[in-house]
Amino acid sequence: MCIGIPMQVMAIEPGYAVCAGRGERRRVSSALVGDCQQGDWLLVFLDSARERIDALRAHEIDATLDMLQAALLGLDASEAQPRFELPSAMAREDLAVLSNSRDSSSY
């Protein structure tokens, strides 16, 4: 399983973006996502921007990574709640939108 890190673009260089996220700064390739602007949010894996995301999605991913980190550290995460709606709590129609499916009857 691959885990992307949400990072915000702080500066632009030709073919690269200097990004900050989860307490670190990285120079990442922007070849897969094209031109970036300062303030954009990117999903980064192996020092390469893989996807453009919005601020809400970045915060959802950060919250999920925080929960995962707490569990890995053995902290009591039994009462941890994500700051977004889990797919298991969504209606069929919402799942269809989430998965870009046109037919929600298969859910």
Swiss-Prot record:
Keyword Transport: no
Keyword Nucleus attached: no
Pfam families associated with the record: HupF_HypC
Keywords: Plasmid
UniProt-listed GO biological process terms: protein maturation
GO MF term list: carbon dioxide binding; iron ion binding
Protein's recorded name: Hydrogenase expression/formation protein HoxL
Family of this protein: Belongs to the HupF/HypC family.
SUPFAM superfamilies xref list: HupF/HypC-like (SSF159127)
Additional free-text comment from the UniProt record: Possibly a metalloprotein.
Superkingdom of origin organism: Bacteria
